[in-house]
Amino acid sequence: MALDASSLTRKLHVFSAKYVKISEETTRRARRLVKDYIEGQIIAYITENSNIEIQKLEYTGSFYEGLKTENADEADIMVVLKTPGSGIEVVQSQVPGYVHLKARDAPMFSKYMSPKGYIKAKKLRNSWFQSYVRRAVNKIEPQPPHSEVRLVVRSHGPAVQVDIIRKGSEEMLLSVDLVPCFQVEDSWYVPKPFKGKRYLSRNELLWRKTFSPKEKQILASMDKDPNGQGGCRHELLRIVKTVVKKPVTSLPLDSYHLKAAFMHYNDRGDLDWVSEDALGKNFFGFLMELQIRMESRNLPNYWLDGINLLDDFKEDVVKQMANRLRRILNSEVRLNKILE
């Protein structure tokens, strides 16, 4: 299909304004809720009452990367725990991307350690972190201008999820994933459960290496050109994240897969991000990149060698995605349809 990049760019700007961009009001509200309830009360309560100390907070995920779409209703915060003076030893496991964490002279973690000194991921998250979050929520004091809310706590993967809900209407104002983690030198580890097919006798000791802070460094600043030219990367990725969820497109790719594919695409040195029709050219180019990845059934983890993110999907699902993308790329009618 011959590409009219200028026309496509105009349509993409209209689509972005209509379906993608989030309002300043909801963004300000999300930041205020994090400040008043998460930082000001939950984190403050844990800091004041637990013998396990919090070193710092890392603000990660789409909201803080400038990639959130439609509504500012989710936030991700990594709660970095202070390690003992003797430090934490990282011991490689047999599972790619997962490690064991061994602590010495660390009485604050003794309840959550194996006899050999390995920190139990699930036990630390549930018995300590989630327990303290629940206690903090039970003592929450309403904070204007958002005082008519209630907080609900639940488990969510490696996180303790705190939902801030408007009383009466039951409207979800903000859902915050709080993830306890350890930072060892320039690496971060979170208690993400292992869900692989092989049986592991001690999977409660596994900690997942996460690259969220490094990912944020790349994604949050990717349009800050040193020459001051900027670019359209943020807008492009927000648009694609929105497009893939539309029923007419229906690609079961989540933000995690799209960010990885985009970082690979962005590493190419021959891309134009600043011309008037750059958005249209790169929208088409990135969809082609996704189609090629699906066709070859190969989307490498951006950070870890030997991990194919498409292994998350059944083979026929990947084939369907490849075919769907090919039909969109080969038909102007279908391409326009996904932007309606």
From Swiss-Prot:
Biological process per Gene Ontology, one example term: innate immune response
E.C. code: 2.7.7.85
This protein's UniProt keywords: ATP-binding, GTP-binding, Immunity, Innate immunity, Magnesium, Manganese, Metal-binding, Nucleotide-binding, Nucleotidyltransferase, Transferase
Task: Report whether Repeat shows up as a keyword of the record.
Answer: no
Reaction catalysed by this enzyme = 2 ATP = 3',3'-c-di-AMP + 2 diphosphate
Q: Which GO terms describe its molecular function?
A: ATP binding; double-stranded DNA binding; GTP binding; metal ion binding; nucleotidyltransferase activity
According to its UniProt record, which cofactors does this protein need? Answer: Mg(2+); Mn(2+)
Q: Which residues bind ATP?
A: S62, E74, A75, D76, K241, S255, Y256, H257, L258, K259
Q: Does the keyword Iron-sulfur apply?
A: no
Could you say which residues bind Mn(2+) here? Answer: D267, D270
Ligand binding (Mg(2+)): E74, D76, D177
Tell me the function of this protein: Nucleotidyltransferase that catalyzes the formation of cyclic di-AMP (3',3'-c-di-AMP) from 2 molecules of ATP and plays a key role in innate immunity. Acts as a key sensor of double-stranded RNA (dsRNA), the presence of dsRNA in the cytoplasm being a danger signal that triggers the immune responses. Directly binds dsRNA, activating the nucleotidyltransferase activity, leading to synthesis of 3',3'-c-di-AMP, a second messenger that binds to and activates Sting, thereby triggering the immune response via activation of the NF-kappa-B transcription factor.
Q: Which PANTHER family match?
A: CELL FATE DETERMINING PROTEIN MAB21-RELATED, CYCLIC GMP-AMP SYNTHASE-LIKE PROTEIN-RELATED
Q: Which family does it belong to?
A: Belongs to the mab-21 family.
Name this protein carries in UniProt: Cyclic GMP-AMP synthase-like receptor 3
User: Lineage of the native species?
Assistant: Eukaryota, Metazoa, Cnidaria, Anthozoa, Hexacorallia
